[in-house]
From Swiss-Prot:
Functional description taken from the UniProt entry: Transfers an acetyl group from acetyl-CoA to L-homoserine, forming acetyl-L-homoserine.
Annotated site residue numbers, Important for substrate specificity: 192
Source organism per UniProt: Bacillus cereus (strain G9842)
Site feature Important for acyl-CoA specificity, where: 111
Protein name: Homoserine O-acetyltransferase
Keywords: Acyltransferase, Amino-acid biosynthesis, Cytoplasm, Methionine biosynthesis, Transferase
Active-site feature positions: 142 (acyl-thioester intermediate), 235 (proton acceptor), 237
Family: Belongs to the MetA family.
CDD domains listed in its UniProt record: GATase1_HTS
């Protein structure tokens, strides 16, 4: 089923080439079913790439989604054209009196800072507090997951000696959880981060349930408030070449960066990446939308 996005959004052409069903607002308004209102708080500097990654996954479901892109009013984005933000994005102030079926909070390249040092932390806290009563379910990704775990439950993050960078095997910790419907007991997901949250801290919080963990990469999936809050420490939304682009960017800057683990064929960066997370990435997003958004949200928000 389709997702509703602005007809001029650049990601639209990318998605149409991949046979992701997108629809204009004009066409959607002639249908009798209600679209799910999904907000994406995009904290990434690579906004257009992140848009395409997330829309690709949430668009691969039998649901009609009305997508609203959000950016932080208290932060100036240097890596994206301001006319793109003005044309396609709203701020929290624009939507704070509305309710949403779902909210996605992305990662951000600020993890080496303490949460309180991030220039938009106060605004993000207001959004996370708002989500508790105005959003049916919120999916937090990578740093967004660390921020959510810290704000809602006081779970700290810890610096890593080396960047967690690559594609890692994970094991399902809890059976018969709707978010993991259709998951294999072992599955892969990319990680790209300099900090971690620890299993011991998660297990100390009775309101949280650890769903998937990795011996090498650590905590990946956590759920709270019976699905009103979902935390994904990895990047199941990543495209095939995202880790490759990150590696080449840092290498070209002269940074000390290792080749992403378990990613390139024969671990050779001159060969193509091996995608081993795509099916479970689609499952993660479709299960979240189906079981924790669509099945739980009221018809009238």
């Amino acid at each position: 089923m389709p997702i509703i996005i602005d007809k001029d959004l650049p990601a639209r052409k990318v998605l149409q080439k991949e046979n992701i069903f997108v629809m204009t607002k004009e066409r959607a308004e002639t249908q009798d079913i209600r679209a799910l209102k999904i907000a994406i708080l995009n904290l990434m500097p690579t906004k257009q790439e992140t848009e395409a990654q997330l829309l690709r996954l949430i668009g691969n479901t039998p649901l009609q989604l009305d997508v609203h892109l959000l950016h932080m009013e208290s932060h100036f984005s240097r890596n994206v054209a301001q006319d793109h933000l003005m044309s396609f994005y709203k701020t929290f102030r624009d939507i704070e009196n509305e309710k949403f079926d779902g909210l996605i909070i992305t990662g951000a390249p600020v993890e080496t800072l303490s949460f309180e040092e991030v220039d938009y932390w106060e605004e993000l806290k207001r959004i996370m507090e708002y989500s508790k009563t105005n959003v049916t379910s919120t999916l937090h990704i990578c740093w967004g997951a660390q921020a959510g775990l810290y704000y809602h439950y006081g779970v700290p993050k810890y610096p890593l000696k080396e960047k967690m960078f690559g594609v890692f095997e994970h094991e399902v910790c809890e059976q018969h959880v709707k978010l993991l419907q259709g998951f294999d007991e072992l599955f892969f997901a990319p990680h790209s981060r300099h900090t971690e949250v620890r299993e011991s801290d998660i297990r100390e919080v009775t309101e949280l349930t650890l769903l998937a963990n990795s011996e090498e990469a650590g905590v990946h999936l956590v759920i709270g408030q019976e699905g009103r809050q979902v935390f994904a420490l990895g990047h199941s939304e990543y495209s095939c070449d995202t880790l490759k682009q990150e590696y080449e960017r840092d290498r070209d800057k002269g940074l000390n960066i290792d080749v992403p683990k378990n990613y390139f064929k024969h671990n050779n960066p001159d060969e193509k990446p091996l995608v081993r997370w795509r099916s479970h990435g689609n499952l993660l997003f479709s299960n979240w939308l189906n079981y924790y958004v669509y099945q739980e949200t009221p018809y009238i928000l």
